[in-house]
Regions:
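Alpha-to-beta junction loops
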Residues: 66-67, 84-93, 137, 170, ...
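A ligand-binding cleft/hinge motif common to bilobed small-molecule-binding domains
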Residues: 81-84, 92-103, 184-208, 212-215
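Extended ligand-binding regions for polar small-molecule ligands
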Residues: 54-64, 124-125, 131-138, 145, ...
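Short loop->beta-strand "edge-of-pocket" segments that line small-molecule binding or catalytic clefts
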Residues: 29-43, 50, 131-148
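Short helix-initiation/N-cap motifs at beta->coil->alpha
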Residues: 70-81, 164-176
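Periplasmic-binding protein-like
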Residues: 34-38, 113-117, 202-238, 257-264
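Ligand-binding cleft/hinge of the Venus flytrap
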Residues: 57-65, 109, 135, 143-168, ...
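Acidic, polar ligand-binding/catalytic clefts
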Residues: 58, 71-133, 146-147, 212
Length: 264
């Protein structure tokens, strides 16, 4: 017969051993869609994304252990289907007005603002009035984007027929078309132009940049209804990144504004 003391010791050892065998609760996997949208996401399908989204994902994962954020490559047109079918849980750097109106989601304000601007070749006598009227001008735009001047209709046929636009999948190509006289105006994000000018400082003097803004990008994260993380929980993580300076570190170099307080 075991003595009470030996029995208690044995039970304690068993309890400790059982606890050691129980694995810690695994972090919940949150799949974030990554569609080519430079400088935010750059060719994610190639597996070496150098954009801002991977930096944000690294910061989110370093901040906590409850969720593991991972990137899932998608595309501008396919991201809607991937979202609805649950292949991705979240789309980041989005706007609810960019074709999401009929798709159930929760919108979380990222507290980030960028802008779409016009860029032309600098010529003697050409000033800001050049951007006032787009009629008759050859435009270079990014295929699939929702532009304010086109009433947010990304249809390629409409862009070509109504706005004499050349559609590409490269902002660099669009800017080079302007530099080489193959297009009159290119539309790019302020953040991308800032990065382009750093990489191509010798070309900066060739371009006339508009004061006119096609649209202001107020960025959101869109969460599907059954996402592993709630809008409130994700908002709290973003707040912590703002408070510890990570948001500023990631986005300020690209002239992406950190707004005073996210609008929820």
């Amino acid at each position: 017969m075991f003595s009470p003391r030996r029995l208690a010791a044995g039970l304690t050892f068993w309890a400790l051993g059982s606890a050691w065998c129980i694995p810690a609760l695994a972090a919940q996997l949150v799949r974030v869609g990554a569609a080519h949208f430079p400088p935010y996401t750059v060719r994610p399908e190639q597996g070496a994304d150098t954009g801002l989204l991977p930096q944000l994902i690294v910061a989110l994962n370093a901040l906590q252990s409850d969720y593991q954020f991972v990137l899932v490559p998608t595309s501008i047109p396919r991201r809607f289907r991937d979202f609805e079918q649950g292949r991705i849980d979240m789309a980041i750097f989005e706007n609810p007005d960019w074709g999401w109106q009929e798709i159930p989601h929760t919108a979380v304000d990222l507290g980030l603002e960028d802008a779409e601007i016009f860029v032309a070749q600098r010529e003697p006598g050409r000033g800001q009035s050049y951007f006032a009227d787009l009629k008759g001008k050859r435009l270079a735009v990014f295929s699939g984007y929702h532009y304010a001047f086109a009433h947010f209709n990304p249809d390629p046929k409409s862009m070509v027929e109504q706005f004499n636009a050349t559609l590409t999948y490269s902002h660099d190509s669009n800017l080079l078309m302007v530099a080489r006289g193959r297009a009159d105006i290119a539309l790019v994000t302020r953040s991308y132009l800032s990065d382009f000018m750093v990489r191509n400082a010798d070309m900066a003097a060739q371009f006339l940049v508009s004061e006119r803004i096609d649209q202001v990008y107020h960025h959101y994260a869109l969460l599907r209804p059954k996402a592993p993380i709630t809008g409130e929980a994700f908002s709290e993580l973003l707040k912590q990144l703002r408070d510890n300076g990570q948001m500023l570190k990631i986005f300020e170099p690209y002239r992406i504004d950190i707004t005073p307080a996210p609008r929820q």
